[in-house]
From Swiss-Prot:
UniProt keyword annotation of Oxidoreductase present: yes
Gene: frhA
Physiological role: Reduces the physiological low-potential two-electron acceptor coenzyme F420, and the artificial one-electron acceptor methylviologen.
Lineage: Archaea, Methanobacteriati, Methanobacteriota, Stenosarchaea group, Methanomicrobia
Record protein name field: Coenzyme F420 hydrogenase subunit alpha
Binding-site residues for Ni(2+), renumbered to this chain: 63, 66, 432, 435
Species assigned in the record: Methanosarcina barkeri (strain Fusaro / DSM 804)
Length: 456
């Protein structure tokens, strides 16, 4: 008999989300809905009527994890709308900033997922805050990797959190020769460390992949060989940086995108009739509680060619590097493989960067209302911003954020997993739920949402 269990909130990811799961008598997920319950940010509406210079600053505040990706995607969406090409050295600085942000994000994700994994050769899971090896050395390496990445980002971008250097038309300033050398030295140090961390993570992930059971709340839970598999496609615009409607050959087509309402996708009202008080942390939702994912979800459901897609590291490697593994562990492996690529990208950009070069376009048009889009391959996947700018003011704005793409795909990937490890499937997407929340609650008591209206 099918029962319903709910995990709310999910843990060790950014933002607030929950899992509403229909499971069989063995606790295997027959249908899973992963949905955002994070308060809406409302960035798209805040952008209307603002100057094109203001909107990237506003968009970067959608969350504290992804401000660089949103700054770059938003800035380049404005440039695409007004038809502004930026100088080569400005693009190099943006790419350095982008790659540094990805390194920082991968390292942070290592911290979030390692407690799910076992120390190879033992029956002990990782506790990165334990005063023992290998936790101490691993944590020290991760912290240093993040420090290197954030420092490079601060030099190239002005700040590591909300970068102040990118602007419409390029960058406010170039870097000095000394700053260029500092970034090169850091990237070389980082390259050694990320190779070590990548190999370490490979060992940890493959060790887990070979296990038959994992322990959750004192219970031995079977670990499926096809954990996190789904039949959806993948979407990526580049292996490293991205694409825009200004490109000669754009790698994303906005006419193939459609956004649907959550009540067209998620399950309707259900009653929780399976509960586990021992589930970490604090137990699952109590029996008798009503849940209504299609009315509670605070995101739209974007589709490409009429279907949800997976975005992120595995999608990038599958699209551009013939990576053919699937599922939860493949996502983890793919993310680690991007570590050294980022350092190599930074070093290549620095080799080509002319510190005396121009970083601001000679002419910045004010726009005629044309639609422009930019896709930034953020750490979590394709981060696509769309804009219409006229006379320097934003007429219309939309954000298609990586986790927004991944919500429906991950929901399908939950099928076949024991419900106790459903969060492991979710964490493999490295969600940033705050970024993905773009619906407005109009009935707070019943958590009813309104459709995000799309205008063309």
């Amino acid at each position: 008999m099918t029962k319903v269990v709910e995990i709310s909130p999910t843990t060790r990811l950014e933002g607030h989300s929950k899992l509403t799961l229909k499971v069989d008598d063995q606790g295997i997920v027959e249908r899973g809905d992963w949905l955002s319950i994070t308060p809406v940010r409302g960035i798209e509406k805040l952008a209307i009527g603002k100057t094109m210079e203001q909107v990237p600053k506003i968009a970067s505040r959608v969350c504290g994890i992804c401000p660089i990706a949103h700054t770059l995607a938003s800035t380049e969406a404005m440039e695409a709308s007004i038809g502004c090409e930026i100088p080569t050295d400005a693009k190099l600085l943006r790419t350095i900033l982008h790659a540094a942000n990805r390194i920082h994000s991968i390292a942070l994700h290592n911290i979030l997922i390692l407690p799910d994994f076992y120390i190879p050769g033992t029956e002990k899971k990782f506790n990165l805050f334990a005063n023992e090896q290998p936790a101490r050395s691993v944590m020290a390496r991760i912290v240093r990797i993040r420090e290197i990445a954030q420092t490079i980002g601060a030099i190239a971008g002005g700040e590591a959190i909300h970068p102040s250097n990118p602007r419409i038309g390029g960058m406010y300033y170039n870097v000095s020769p000394r700053a260029k050398q500092k970034m090169a030295d850091l990237a070389k140090e980082g390259l050694v460390l990320v190779h070590e961390q990548m190999e370490f993570m490979f060992d940890v992930i493959r060790n887990m992949q070979n296990r038959e059971f994992v322990e959750v709340a004192g219970k031995q839970i079977p670990l499926p060989k096809k954990l996190g598999y789904h039949n959806q496609g993948v979407m990526a615009t580049a292996s490293m940086y991205g694409s825009s409607s200004l490109d000669d050959n754009p790698t994303w087509d906005f006419t193939r995108w459609k956004e649907t309402r959550p009540w067209d996708w998620y399950m309707g009202e259900v009653t929780i009739d399976l509960e586990d008080p021992s589930y970490p942390i604090g137990g699952t939702t109590k029996i008798g509680t009503k849940a209504n994912p299609q009315m509670e979800a605070c995101t739209g459901v974007p589709t490409y060619d009429g279907q949800p897609v997976e975005v992120g590291p595995r999608a990038r490697l599958a699209t551009f590097k013939n990576f053919d593994e699937k599922g939860t562990f493949a996502q983890h492996i793919a993310r680690q493989m991007e570590y050294p690529d980022c350092c190599y990208t930074i070093l290549r950009c620095l080799d080509n960067l002319n510190t005396s070069g121009k970083v601001l376009a000679d002419h910045i048009p004010q726009g005629d209302g044309s639609m422009g889009w930019a896709a930034n391959e953020a750490p979590r996947g394709s981060n696509i911003h769309l804009a219409r700018v006229k006379d320097g003011k934003v007429l219309w704005y939309d954000m298609l954020v990586p986790t927004t793409w991944n919500f429906p795909t991950c929901s399908r990937a939950l099928t076949g997993a024991p419900w106790q490890i459903a969060e492991m499937v979710v964490r493999a997407y490295d969600p940033c739920v705050s970024c993905a929340t773009h619906m407005i609650v109009v009935n707070e008591e019943e958590k009813i949402v309104t459709q995000k209206l799309m205008q063309w």
